[in-house]
Amino acid sequence: MRVVIALGGNALLKRGEPMTAEVQRQNIKIAAEAIAPIAAEHQIVVTHGNGPQVGLLALQGSAYKPEEAYPLDILGAETEGMIGYMLEQELGNVLPFEVPLATILTMVEVDGNDPGFQNPTKFVGPVYDASEAGELHQQKGWVFKQDGNKWRRVVASPIPRRIFELRPIQWLLDKGAVVICAGGGGIPTMYERGKERTLIGVEAVIDKDLCSALLARDIEADLLILATDAEAVFTGWGTPERKAIFKTNPRRLGEFSFPAGSMGPKVEAACHFVNATGRVAAIGALADIPAMVRAERGTIISSSFSDITWHVEVPIPGPASRPV
């Protein structure tokens, strides 16, 4: 079976943790241990978030003069190399030596007329209090939006249209490699207006879940797993009536609304993939990845399900909850 596993930002850096290399390495080690059992039996592609990392590099780059600072597309490429290296190393420490690993810098085409450029929504970088965010807005012109009780920088997040490195990814998979690619949604690029053969970088960050769904569709994956810090997709989140969805179809899932900055993009990406391919998507906790492959944990989304079944209790990492 061919599986795309999209690691949420929590797989690399949990909220409130310092953005140090050692902290990220420890989190990536946990992710590698969850992925390894799947890689031993299936063809695996791993994608990952990079919001905190690309934001940190942008903050470091602010020491440059504005005209000398590196743009977001280059910072995104840097994070793909950095995180890909750490994932390769930790996966290599738990997989058999003969399993090849490869990280691919992945350029992704976007449309210069995408409405996302007019309404920045993608969180990048660390959290700030209101006064710090205000100062940075005045100094650098950055746009901020509230994220919980803090503030974070937001940038444009255009829809991914095409993955340029698709063929090399497929070649490596066919040779048995575990492929790490499309980190942070890939490097946003487009053809320069009036120059059909000139590819240029774009100051934006692509949603990694939507890019993972596009990748999974194009490589004909059997399963798309979106790993996050929640054990399943919940209705009534934050209320006493919250319930965890076990199995459902895209139509029924579309009847609910989910937060735009967290679960919303994952649900949208999962439904896109299922509707486009007729295959299966799963959303759940990082530790539950092996159980999601077996359709025992998380929220499993398939057009073959006629309605919704619920986890009897809030699922926690471990044996699957019994469905209603």
From Swiss-Prot:
Q: Which organism is it from?
A: Rhizobium meliloti (strain 1021) (Ensifer meliloti)
Cite the EC number. 2.7.2.2
What Gene Ontology molecular-function terms does this entry list? ATP binding; carbamate kinase activity
Q: In which pathway does it act?
A: Amino-acid degradation; L-arginine degradation via ADI pathway
Family classification = Belongs to the carbamate kinase family.
> What InterPro entries does its record include?
AceGlu_kinase-like_sf, Asp/Glu/Uridylate_kinase, Carb_kinase
Which reaction is catalysed here? Answer: hydrogencarbonate + NH4(+) + ATP = carbamoyl phosphate + ADP + H2O + H(+)
What GO biological process term is on the record, naming one? Answer: arginine deiminase pathway
Name of the protein described by the UniProt record: Carbamate kinase
Q: Which gene encodes it?
A: arcC
Assigned keywords, A-Z: Arginine metabolism, ATP-binding, Cytoplasm, Kinase, Nucleotide-binding, Plasmid, Transferase
Q: Name one Pfam family in it.
A: AA_kinase
According to its UniProt record, where is this protein located? Cytoplasm
Q: Which GO terms describe its cellular component?
A: cytosol
Q: Does the keyword Nucleus apply?
A: no
